[in-house]
């Protein structure tokens, strides 16, 4: 099942690292969207508020899982991986 992965960045080195980690580890069916928190875009502002993004990098999966910072685990799409995220990082 494809997932929506949203990454909130601030242009920092760690943010770029997270984007690269997720880009390499996600499957071809998952949708990746990257948002710059410094943007004046209304969609970005609303998503930041909705997900309570107060630090970057932050990864939100399917609107119900949030990982803040650089993950200390490998990012590989798969059912077991998303169960792990859901168990440990639910919003």
Stretches found by the model and what they are:
Residues 1-29:
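Local sequence-structure signature of Cys/Sec-based thiol-disulfide redox active-site neighborhoods
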Residues 8-10, 29-44:
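Thiol-based oxidoreductase modules, predominantly thioredoxin-like and allied folds used
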Residues 13-14, 40, 73:
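Glycine-/small-residue-rich active-site loops that bind phosphorylated ligands and cofactors
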Residues 17, 58, 69:
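Short acidic, gly/pro-rich beta-turn/loop elements at beta-sheet edges
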Residues 22-24, 47-51:
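Short, aromatic/basic amphipathic alpha-helical patches
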Residues 49-61:
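Structural micro-motif
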Residues 61-91:
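Non-catalytic, surface beta->alpha helical segment in thiol-disulfide oxidoreductase systems
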């Amino acid at each position: 099942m494809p997932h929506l992965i949203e990454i909130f960045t601030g242009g920092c080195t760690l943010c770029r690292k997270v984007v690269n980690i997720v880009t390499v580890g996600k499957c071809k069916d998952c949708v990746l969207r990257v948002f710059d928190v410094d943007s004046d875009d209304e969609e970005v502002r609303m998503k930041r508020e909705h997900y309570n993004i107060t630090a970057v990098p932050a990864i939100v999966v399917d609107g119900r899982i949030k990982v803040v910072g650089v993950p200390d685990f490998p990012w590989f799409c798969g059912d077991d991986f998303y169960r792990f995220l859901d168990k440990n990082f639910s919003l």
